[in-house]
Curated annotation (Swiss-Prot):
Name of the molecule in the record: Mitogen-activated protein kinase HOG1
Annotated region described as Disordered, given as residue ranges: 354-377
Pfam families hit by this protein: Pkinase (PF00069)
Keyword Cytoplasm: yes
Compartments, as annotated in UniProt: Cytoplasm; Nucleus
Named cofactor requirement(s): Mg(2+)
Record-listed Phosphothreonine modification sites: T174
Signal peptide: none
Organism whose genome encodes this protein: Candida albicans (strain SC5314 / ATCC MYA-2876)
Amino acid sequence: MSADGEFTRTQIFGTVFEITNRYTELNPVGMGAFGLVCSAVDRLTGQNVAVKKVMKPFSTSVLAKRTYRELKLLKHLKHENLITLDDIFISPLEDIYFVNELQGTDLHRLLNSRPLEKQFIQYFTYQIMRGLKYIHSAGVIHRDLKPSNILINENCDLKICDFGLARLQDPQMTGYVSTRYYRAPEIMLTWQKYDTEVDLWSVGCILAEMIEGKPLFPGKDHVHQFSIITELLGSPPADVIDTICSENTLRFVQSLPHRDPIPFSERFASCTHVEPEAIDLLAKLLVFDPKKRISAVEGLTHPYMEAYHDPTDEPVCESKFDWSFNDADLPVDTWRVMMYSEILDFHQTVGVANETEGSEQPDSQVEQNNLDSANGA
């Protein structure tokens, strides 16, 4: 590791990690499509943290916008069951680093290690629902809920992470977004006109996986994915088929043999280790018609959640998220300036809070200098 002014550099998995001297003892913990995550020790607080490197965020306007969106969301969404932003900085190589509290594991790793006992399945489902209630109240859809995006610490506290694909509530949304196993059928059928209900479908898939210890709908491709969904739910109802806009998709659905649904009580009859209420909630989550699917607010009042449900401790977001930037088609340099400005604002806000608490925040002047440079000052 070599020092470079305020930053230190090290090679991890062949990738340069260039972070401020505030963070030491880097160890890789995960690699994703958009970045590398390392654990580290925050010398300012003594806490263990996760440092996520977003690789080449300014290489294209699409990547720059995606990173800007994730930053804005992390700054806006503040809830016990959502990952929070502790620090953010841009390195001299212009990579962006997000810093969060380090969680012990994620649900994907937990499910691969051992079967979950029923009380953990119930508690994790409750916390996911509680977080989604807050997210949806802000006018945000996560769009990529899956076990690897659900972080869990040693106290079984759960936090939803990875808002890179999150979008606003918009009846005309399009795109091929969530990981296939957890993807709602309306995304596969229409690729548009979907809403917060797509997240509840994902919760259903996750709940089923916690119950059985394996993915419920392990599709090899989206055709196979849809086919195995119909094996459980039966053929989609006519009003769902009527929403299909693509002629090719419509022909595909109409070509499938008619299937009758399998009752959930029959399909999950062997799952005697969980309460019948869990299977009832599952049946209300995994519904073809999104308008008939249970919402996060409704899910929290379901009998399966009774042990944890507390209407006085299930907050909503104080304000809707501002999506005004989302349709902007801007050059990379503009996104860069906007990003620096957001980072500076974050450090100034944190700095005021830390001054109140008697600690210091060292990075705001660095970011001000970077912003001046980005603006050509």
